[in-house]
Regions:
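Noncatalytic, beta-rich nucleic-acid-contacting surfaces in large DNA/RNA-processing enzymes
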Residues: 1-223
Length: 223
């Protein structure tokens, strides 16, 4: 979450709530970053771009992501809403798209086209276009529950780092106690944050890094 790319994305998106953090995790991956999805999402978030939906029924499914198919669950919802797929069928299609199973996709595509015509009178050409769109985004789609879980961990750690920086950095150093390179890197990070790392002291130091007032005491096991 602290990489330069993610930091820039957060500046561009300007999150205002926890719900705004969830799509960040799904957006900052190789697939979305190379397709224009990120730019479309950010523009939609700030009201600079209106999503062009292929069918009005897509609006409630894609409203929260500004017309961008971002999550795997949205692929499942769209097939269910437009073609009457059961959630079981929708999940089979999602997996087939993710693994690019050609035979399975061909049969599911025809079922989608037939279902869309039966449920909502959608013409074959439009159904094929929507299916192609789903297939394109399914390769990049991220599980929303996973994205939410990662966002929560990021939010919690960011809170601790902001409000309890000494304790947070001491715990971080202890997590890399056996990795001299990482320890050195995080000691430099402490200095940049204005946190002093005190030298090891046989009379004061414990095995690990510990909080010593507003400083961190070097742990004996890290020598």
């Amino acid at each position: 979450m602290e990489s330069s790319g993610m930091t820039q994305l957060m500046r561009d998106l300007a999150p205002e709530s926890f719900d705004d953090l969830i799509p960040l995790v799904a957006l900052y991956r190789p697939g979305p970053l190379g397709t224009g999805m990120v730019e479309d999402f950010v523009a939609g978030r700030h009201g600079k771009k209106t999503a062009k939906l292929l069918h009005p029924l897509l609006e409630p499914v894609l409203k929260d992501t500004f017309g961008v198919i971002l999550y795997q669950e949205q692929v499942m919802q769209i097939t269910s809403v437009l073609a009457g797929f059961s959630l079981g069928q929708a999940d089979i299609l999602r997996r087939a798209m993710g693994k690019k199973k050609a035979k399975e996709l061909d049969s599911m595509k025809e079922a989608f086209i037939v279902g869309a015509a039966k449920e909502h009178g959608i013409k074959r050409e439009l159904a094929e276009e929507i299916f192609a769109l789903l297939q394109h985004f399914a390769g990049y789609g991220f599980n929303k529950s996973h994205s939410a879980a990662y966002a929560l961990v990021a939010y919690q750690t960011a809170y601790l780092k902001a409000h309890y920086p000494v304790e947070f950095m001491a715990a971080t150093l202890n997590s890399y106690l056996a990795n001299a390179e990482k320890v050195s890197w995080y000691i430099n990070a402490c200095r940049e944050m204005g946190i002093q790392v005190l030298p090891p002291d046989v009379n004061v130091s414990g095995a690990g890094f510990s909080v010593d007032g507003h400083s961190i005491r070097f742990g004996l096991a890290g020598i």
